[in-house]
Amino acid sequence: MISKANKNATRKKRHGRVRRTIIGTAARPRLNVFRSNKNIYVQVIDDATHATLASASSLDLEKGNTTDAASAVGKLAAERALEKGIETVVFDRGGYLYHGRIKAVAEAAREAGLKF
């Protein structure tokens, strides 16, 4: 009998492969997205110093639709990054498909002024 692959394990393997090439620096940090069933979390990370420069999550917001919350989190993360003087980032989708909540975060961050 063939066993079904665990979606999260497959995503983690995909994210590991991508992380070998995506590296955030102080000049161009990494915008990392983590999606749970209930919330979405975004961090702006400098991989050289292993420091989180800015972050936002749906826990900071009022209750709402998941896609609307994702775009609000993307906008909030972009505003916090711009306050710290970060204008360009490398987008790390965390092994997720560029669709739905991940796409909403990316588009809202771009509209708020981040370049990637």
Swiss-Prot record:
<dbReference type="GO" id="GO:0006412">
    <property type="term" value="P:translation"/>
</dbReference>
<keyword id="KW-0694">RNA-binding</keyword>
<dbReference type="Pfam" id="PF00861">
    <property type="entry name" value="Ribosomal_L18p"/>
</dbReference>
<keyword id="KW-0699">rRNA-binding</keyword>
<keyword id="KW-0689">Ribosomal protein</keyword>
<keyword id="KW-0687">Ribonucleoprotein</keyword>
<dbReference type="GO" id="GO:0003735">
    <property type="term" value="F:structural constituent of ribosome"/>
</dbReference>
<comment type="similarity">
    <text>Belongs to the universal ribosomal protein uL18 family.</text>
</comment>
<dbReference type="InterPro" id="IPR005484">
    <property type="entry name" value="Ribosomal_uL18_bac/euk"/>
</dbReference>
<dbReference type="GO" id="GO:0008097">
    <property type="term" value="F:5S rRNA binding"/>
</dbReference>
<comment type="subunit">
    <text>Part of the 50S ribosomal subunit; part of the 5S rRNA/L5/L18/L25 subcomplex. Contacts the 5S and 23S rRNAs.</text>
</comment>
<dbReference type="GO" id="GO:0022625">
    <property type="term" value="C:cytosolic large ribosomal subunit"/>
</dbReference>
<comment type="function">
    <text>This is one of the proteins that bind and probably mediate the attachment of the 5S RNA into the large ribosomal subunit, where it forms part of the central protuberance.</text>
</comment>
<protein>
    <recommendedName>
        <fullName>Large ribosomal subunit protein uL18</fullName>
    </recommendedName>
</protein>
<dbReference type="InterPro" id="IPR004389">
    <property type="entry name" value="Ribosomal_uL18_bac-type"/>
</dbReference>
